[in-house]
Amino acid sequence: MIVFLLKRILLLYLIFFVPKSFSENLPFFKIKSYSEKKEFFQNDNEKVGYSLGVSLGNYVNESFERQKKMGINLDKYNILLGVQDAISGNLKLSNEEISTILQKLEKNLKNAAKIEFEKSEKENLIQGKLYMKKFSEMKGVSKTSSGLLYIIDKLGEGEEIKTKNAEITVHYKGSLINGTEFDSSYKRGKPITLMLKDVILGWQEGLKYIKKGGKIKLIIPPNLGYGSNRINEIPANSILIFDIELLDIKNI
């Protein structure tokens, strides 16, 4: 039961509190000199074990800072004490007490994550509206009744998209308003072929404004993108920016 609870708690950490980089934090213990470091370890296995311990410690350090901002305060000493006692088999709390405490921690983490999610969701809506307003005032930008913004870089020639059942081949780059790139077929080195009906609404609408060989920039509001859903690196209620090159069209 305790192991199961701990796995669920660690999963919550991974989803909401994963540190950007372990190297951003100082290790809990410091080695005074290179010579001491060289003499301390007897073989590679000892170094591997130590490295795993440092990674865990850095992870805990980063988690502390994130938790403090959410009103969850834990101390390093007792975590290290718990690890030590678990290894030695000399526990200071019963399994029943530990299970109850971990259940409460899991509940607190879920509540904290929900609050953080809602805060991020509202902030994205505010910043997104400001970005859309500013972008809409730029030269060459068109706006549709649905709220989609677009700039045609190259109209293309020949075949046009005539139905949602069309099969399209595209090169594209997707990013957020802060410049974070979340996907790119260019980086993968090859275009992607898919059915128009299977892509987000912003693509379905926007790609109809260009022909085969055309290029377009789409600024997609949440209602035409992923809405309030969090998709991998894309926060809820995000404005999506896509630069798309329409390479081929097959109207089926």
Curated annotation (Swiss-Prot):
GO terms for MF: peptidyl-prolyl cis-trans isomerase activity
Claim: Isomerase is one of the keywords in the record: yes
Alphabetical list of Gene3D superfamilies matching this protein: 3.10.50.40, Peptidyl-prolyl cis-trans isomerase, FKBP-type, N-terminal domain
Domain PPIase FKBP-type: 165-252
Domain of life: Bacteria
Keywords recorded for this protein, A-Z: Isomerase, Rotamase
EC nos: 5.2.1.8
InterPro entries reported in the protein's UniProt record: PPIase_dom_sf, PPIase_FKBP_dom, PPIase_FKBP_N, PPIase_FKBP_N_sf
SUPFAM superfamilies: FKBP-like
Entry's Gene Ontology BP terms: protein folding
Catalysed transformations (reactions): [protein]-peptidylproline (omega=180) = [protein]-peptidylproline (omega=0)
UniProt-listed PANTHER family: 39 KDA FK506-BINDING NUCLEAR PROTEIN, FKBP-TYPE PEPTIDYL-PROLYL CIS-TRANS ISOMERASE FKPA
Family: Belongs to the FKBP-type PPIase family.
Protein task: PPIases accelerate the folding of proteins. It catalyzes the cis-trans isomerization of proline imidic peptide bonds in oligopeptides.
Name of the protein in its database record: FKBP-type peptidyl-prolyl cis-trans isomerase FkpA
